[in-house]
């Protein structure tokens, strides 16, 4: 009888001990020896990760995700504690597990201008920000990526430097726009689509295109069913009275704002009316797709794009976190870190951008990470008219979007759509952009409630931390882990030592 009583007491104690061990395993997923010489901070290529908030199958809830051989092998939705014995298991508690971000608009500046950023620092910053795939723009590197030969130079420059996966856009410029064989050579070499400017780009070997160049380029793109990304600003034929006065202070942000009014975006999109119509079913370039990058004007320009979509044109639109986080009224005079093109507009416009994003009229988000060497930002001089335009942002886009989107009621599912699912569709990235069986295990784990201050002590992995407009800001949403192809490439402010991201080429 005594033995039976003792046994009755021991079994519950063993159960408690097992539960405690499980809790310890789950709440402390990484050992102090986190690290290694290879591609991953974890020593396994087959493991489970779990949390109370997994974004998958259009829902957010408890689930465990099996990662095997770089892919998502299975998902167990519901009470995942039963998977404790399927070792190794990493439980992130109530942190969010969602698809890694896909940033379709980043300038990594290599080859030729690695002093601005470069593949190594840019992709390390991306990994620290939960971005698992970047698509690099064809300009700001030198030479610009406008031919098969210049794409090869970029691929050579990227070798052994990629901490996340990287695809490449090619350039549509006057020298190749009217030459189908030249464009086909570039597309056959593997660029995911093309990019053009309707105004001067600021880069000498990347000249602007006109509507004829765009319309002819779309005919070639239609054969490949790849997109044309367009910087939609054009100097109107007749400037209105709101243009800048030569006597205005170049340090005043209002001076720069007046120098690139919404009329520039409106003029460009009006010029694209015929090109957009050509993408409709039965149109001259049916199968092609126009993507408007970094939309800033949430009024007339957005209205024109909404009309084109409703009429059947294949058009998509992105905006960027800096247009959603900042407003013209908040930009300090002389603080050229905030200069970008198109410019950050007023707070009413910012609210309208959020509304359009929530309503689906803006399809997705991108960083438009566009750094430079610090001296080009003219931060001491503070001249907005002469400083390089571009926001340095790769590491911060997820917390910035979440921090400013909370007051507009954004959801985790919307975040995954804007930053993962829709960008994957634009770039033709199959088996990316979702946490689903058979998809590449590109995953970010983050804590939305965790707040942090981007002060001088916060680790920043961009090449030049001092040029970012986000420094000094209080943000919510700490990145805990980033997995690329099943490799844990970033966790606990550590990067995997080897750069094992892959170049992505269209087939």
From Swiss-Prot:
Its cofactor is Zn(2+). Belongs to the metallo-dependent hydrolases superfamily. Allantoinase family. Carboxylation allows a single lysine to coordinate two zinc ions. One of its GO terms (biological process) is allantoin catabolic process. It catalyses: (S)-allantoin + H2O = allantoate + H(+). The keyword Hydrolase applies. Keywords: Hydrolase, Metal-binding, Purine metabolism, Zinc. Homotetramer. Binds 2 Zn(2+) ions per subunit. Disulfide bonds: none annotated. Catalyzes the conversion of allantoin (5-ureidohydantoin) to allantoate by hydrolytic cleavage of the five-member hydantoin ring. Catalyzes the first step of the ureide allantoin degradation followed by the sequential activity of AAH, UGLYAH and UAH which allows a complete purine breakdown without the intermediate generation of urea. Pathway: Nitrogen metabolism; (S)-allantoin degradation; allantoate from (S)-allantoin: step 1/1. The modification N6-carboxylysine is found at residue 195. Its EC number is 3.5.2.5. The keyword Transport does not apply. GO terms for molecular function: allantoinase activity; cobalt ion binding; zinc ion binding. Zn(2+) 2 binds at residues 195, 231, 294. PANTHER family: ALLANTOINASE. GO terms for cellular component: cytoplasm. Zn(2+) 1 binds at residues 105, 107, 195, 368. This is Probable allantoinase.
């Amino acid at each position: 009888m005594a033995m039976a009583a003792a046994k009755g007491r021991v079994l519950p104690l063993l159960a408690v001990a097992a539960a405690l061990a499980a809790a310890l395993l789950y709440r402390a997923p990484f050992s102090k020896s986190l690290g290694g010489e290879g591609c991953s901070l974890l020593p396994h290529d087959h493991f489970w990760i779990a949390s109370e908030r997994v974004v998958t199958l259009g829902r957010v809830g408890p689930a465990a995700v099996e990662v095997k051989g770089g892919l998502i092998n299975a998902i167990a939705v519901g009470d995942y504690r039963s998977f404790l014995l399927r070792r190794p298991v990493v439980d992130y508690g109530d942190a969010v597990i969602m698809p890694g971000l896909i940033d379709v608009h980043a300038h990594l500046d290599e080859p030729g201008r690695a002093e601005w950023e470069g593949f190594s620092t840019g992709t390390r910053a991306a990994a620290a920000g939960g971005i698992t795939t970047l698509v690099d723009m064809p300009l700001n590197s030198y030479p610009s990526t406008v031919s098969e030969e210049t794409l090869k130079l970029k691929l050579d420059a990227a070798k052994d430097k990629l901490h996340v996966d990287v695809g490449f856009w090619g350039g549509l410029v006057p020298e190749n726009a009217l030459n189908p064989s030249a464009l086909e050579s570039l597309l056959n070499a593997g660029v995911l689509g093309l990019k053009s400017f309707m105004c001067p780009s600021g880069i000498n070997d990347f000249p602007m295109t006109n509507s004829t160049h765009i319309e002819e380029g779309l005919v070639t793109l239609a054969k490949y069913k790849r997109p044309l990304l367009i910087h939609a600003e054009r100097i109107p034929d007749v400037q209105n009275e709101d243009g800048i006065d030569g006597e205005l202070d170049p340090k005043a942000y209002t001076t720069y704002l007046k120098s690139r009014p919404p009329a520039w975006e409106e003029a460009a999109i009006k010029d694209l009316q015929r090109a957009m119509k050509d993408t409709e079913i039965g149109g001259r370039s049916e199968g092609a797709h126009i993507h408007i990058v970094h939309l800033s004007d949430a009024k007339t320009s957005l209205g024109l794009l909404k009309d084109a979509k409703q009429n059947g044109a294949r058009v998509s639109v992105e905006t960027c976190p800096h247009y959603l986080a900042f407003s013209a009224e908040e930009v300090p005079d002389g603080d050229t870190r905030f200069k970008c093109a198109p410019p950050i507009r007023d707070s009413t416009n910012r609210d309208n951008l959020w509304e359009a994003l929530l309503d689906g009229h803006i399809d997705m988000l991108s960083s438009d990470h566009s750094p430079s060497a610090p001296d080009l930002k003219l931060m001491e001089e503070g001249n907005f008219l002469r400083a390089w335009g571009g926001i340095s942002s790769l590491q911060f886009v997820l917390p910035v979007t979440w921090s400013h989107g909370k007051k507009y009621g954004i959801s985790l599912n919307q975040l995954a759509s804007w930053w993962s699912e829709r960008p994957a569709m634009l770039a033709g990235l199959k088996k990316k952009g979702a946490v689903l069986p058979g998809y590449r295990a590109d995953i970010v784990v983050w804590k939305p409630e965790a707040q942090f201050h981007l002060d001088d002590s916060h680790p920043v992995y961009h090449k030049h931390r001092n040029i970012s407009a986000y420094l000094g800001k209080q943000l919510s949403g700490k990145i805990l882990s980033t997995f690329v192809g099943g490799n844990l490439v970033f966790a606990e402010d550590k990067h995997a030592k080897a750069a094992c991201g892959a170049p992505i080429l269209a087939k």
